Swiss-Prot record:
Record-given protein name: Succinyl-CoA:3-ketoacid-coenzyme A transferase, mitochondrial
Involved pathway(s): Ketone metabolism; succinyl-CoA degradation; acetoacetyl-CoA from succinyl-CoA: step 1/1
Active site feature: E340
Primary gene name: Scot
Protein family: Belongs to the 3-oxoacid CoA-transferase family.
Annotated EC: 2.8.3.5
Length: 516
């Protein structure tokens, strides 16, 4: 039952009574009190065809699954969905994409959703790929009333130069391409102008709310949910628990209620981990299986990468070999690992009983955190990155060039992954960029070239390249310098397998390996 205010009272008395009235709420029946709605169906009832909607979450962590299902049930069509990821085929935004309810996706990574990629390449869906940090800032700025901003991310790539395929025709030709963006120089560095996003609706998922709309998120499920709360005409939060006013300490509130228009309590959440990774207890009675050749190769690269870590360093590691390198950080060395989805202080993979779907890394893998770790939203995460506060970033590549160009996010018309946070990471001032990769493609062709043939992730951004065969440094005006050669290879081998000219260091040495 709803409590009602009556009578003519002083302002102070009215305020006190208002708080008591709001605290006396019921979620039973069709009625709602202030911001509290009965259900997802009730909360999304006024969403019309053609709406632009921000969908919180990262992969399938922290997604507003009840509202997504309500939109499916309601049958809203022609949605422009703004989401960091396209979810997977049967979860997250993928639910609406599969039903052909989404006409356009604005996001940074789509590689895990095969149906999204199919619709995009076959001309059924428009996709505007946007660097993850730029997307977070477009949303943050939109919520702060800032119409546009400048960022170093994406300069001299398709993001800035235009020409990125947004929509294909049925016959596979590019029907709509991205437009060229303005550039301005500040202190000798080029910056790209990006317009902000302010949507019709923002659908977010939180752990707790009070009737005023104050929100608390759980661990890494804060991600894009936090900035999206601020950047829409109507923000709806689905939560696992609604607590009375005053139950949340002001210090623990992550998003103030001023940004939230509607809340409802969801039930029976289907929380999943997209990539379950666990640490298996070692059985000393069972010998470890012999490593396969691919594993030996990866570990050789990872053990060389680990020599670049130093005590007190902040590092961001891409998926695959970069993450593997963290296994070789020397005991006693303190390296804080940053993850774009909002974690500082990543730990090892959890044991089976410690898996938490609200605690994943940027590769959507289950993780733990170390003592002293912290959680934050995606906008804060990329402020750390873009601001140059991360000392080193280690990424994979499809191609690299002799001048330090990097290509690792798409093959036009064939492979669509998205750039994720890579463009932001490599554009950060003062951050050392190391590329780890196999020296050659599966067909034997070189991946180190004079000029990249694929769309760039960054121009002139690489500082070091580490493969299973060699280590190169990259310097402006100098190009590639071979500084180390792996055991079993010669300089002639490196020349034969590299598609770019390079200088051999006078101090050339055998490739280093951190002891194990």
């Amino acid at each position: 039952m709803l409590c009602r205010l009556v009578g003519n009272r002083s302002l102070g008395a009215r305020y006190t009574a208002s708080i008591k009235a709001i605290a006396c709420y019921s979620t039973s029946g069709k009625q709602r009190n202030g911001k509290i709605y009965e259900s997802a169906i009730d909360a999304v009832a006024d969403v019309q065809d053609g709406a632009q909607i921000l969908f919180g979450g990262f992969g399938i962590c922290g997604i507003p699954e009840k509202m997504i299902n309500a939109l499916k049930q309601k049958g809203v069509k022609n949605i422009t969905g703004v989401s960091n990821n396209g979810g997977v085929d049967d979860t997250g935004l993928g639910v609406l994409i599969k039903q052909k309810q989404v006409s356009k996706v604005i996001g940074s990574y789509v590689g895990e959703n095969t149906e999204l990629v199919r619709q995009y390449l076959e001309g059924e869906l428009a996709v505007e790929l946007t660097p993850q940090g730029t997307l977070a800032e477009k949303i943050r700025a939109g919520g702060a009333g800032i119409p546009a901003f400048y960022t170093p991310t994406g300069y001299a790539t398709l993001v800035q130069e235009g020409g990125a395929p947004i929509k294909y025709s049925k016959d596979g030709k590019v029907e709509i391409s991205s437009e060229k963006k303005p550039v301005k120089e500040f202190n000798g560095k080029n910056y790209v102008m990006e317009e902000s996003i302010f949507a019709d609706f923002a659908f977010v998922k939180a752990q707790k709310a009070d009737p005023l709309g104050n929100l608390v998120f759980n661990k890494a499920a804060r991600n894009f949910n936090a900035p999206m709360c601020r950047a829409a005409k109507i923000t709806v939060a689905e939560v696992e628990e609604i607590v009375p006013i005053g139950a949340l300490s002001p210090d623990e509130i992550h998003v103030p209620g001023i940004y939230i228009n509607r809340i409802f309590k969801g039930t029976n959440y289907n929380k999943r981990v997209e990539r379950l990774r666990i640490t298996e207890p070692k059985d000393p009675s069972k010998p470890a299986p012999p490593p396969n050749p691919a594993q030996v190769l990866r570990e050789r690269i990872a053990r060389r990468v680990a020599l670049e870590f130093h005590d007190g360093m902040y590092a961001n590691l891409g998926i695959g070999i970069p993450v593997l390198s963290s296994n070789y950080i020397p005991k006693g060395m303190n390296v804080m690992l940053q993850s774009e989805n909002g974690i500082l202080g990543l730990g090892p993979f959890p044991t089976k009983d410690k898996v938490d779907p609200d605690l994943i890394n940027a590769g959507k893998e289950s993780v733990t955190v170390v003592p002293g770790a912290s959680y934050f939203g995606s906008d804060d995460s990329f402020a750390m990155i873009r601001g140059g506060h991360v000392d080193i970033t280690i990424l994979g590549a499809m191609e690299v060039s002799a001048t330090g160009d990097l290509a690792n996010w798409m093959i036009p018309g064939k492979l669509v992954k998205g750039m994720g946070g890579a463009m932001d990471l490599v554009a950060a001032p003062g951050t050392k960029v190391i590329i780890t990769m196999e020296h050659n493609a599966r067909d034997g062709s070189p991946k180190i070239l004079d000029t990249c043939s694929l769309p760039l992730t960054g121009k002139g951004v690489i500082d070091m390249i580490i493969s299973e065969k060699a280590v190169f440094t990259v310097e402006k005006g100098v190009g590639l310098t071979l500084i180390e050669v792996a055991e079993g290879y010669t300089v002639d081998d490196i020349i034969a397998s590299t598609g770019a000219k390079f200088t051999v260091s006078p101090n050339l040495k055998k490739m280093g390996q951190i002891p194990v």
